[in-house]
Amino acid sequence: MALDPRPAAGMVFFERREIDLLMRLYGRMVAAGEWRDYGMAGLTDHAVFSIFRHAAEAPLYRVEKRPDLARKQGQWAVVGQGGVVLRRGHDLAQVLRVFDKGRFKVVD
């Protein structure tokens, strides 16, 4: 059925708690004037939350969920422009701390 809210078999996507954490961070950064748009994608092996300064640009950051790395390096990663992994771990809240004020600054 086309309107079935469940993800297709084999698809990876974010859970409600994870989306809540991501949207809280996004709202805080939009209020600070640093971010303008976002996008989410659920793929067969990972899910991606992309963050944009302008909708027509490449993403500034990507928050990736890769369940196959959960027992290794951690399923969560924040990836910057150019594919640089800024932080990786097992807990989303800890990984998102890379965006805490004073720890990281966007440079144009």
What is each stretch, according to the model?
Residues 44-47, 54-59, 69:
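Short, charged/polar surface micro-motifs in flexible loops or helix N-caps
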Residues 50-52, 77:
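Residue-level detector of beta-strand face positions
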Residues 77-106:
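Mixed-charge, glycine-accented linear interaction segment located at domain edges/termini
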Residues 2-3, 106-108:
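Short, intrinsically disordered, low-complexity terminal/loop segments
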Residues 1-48:
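Negatively charged, low-complexity tracts enriched in Asp/Glu with abundant Ser/Thr
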Residues 1, 42, 73-74, 84:
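Intrinsic low-complexity, intrinsically disordered or marginally ordered coil/linker segments
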Residues 62-83:
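Short aromatic-glycine-(Arg/Gly/Cys) micro-motifs in beta-strand/loop hairpins
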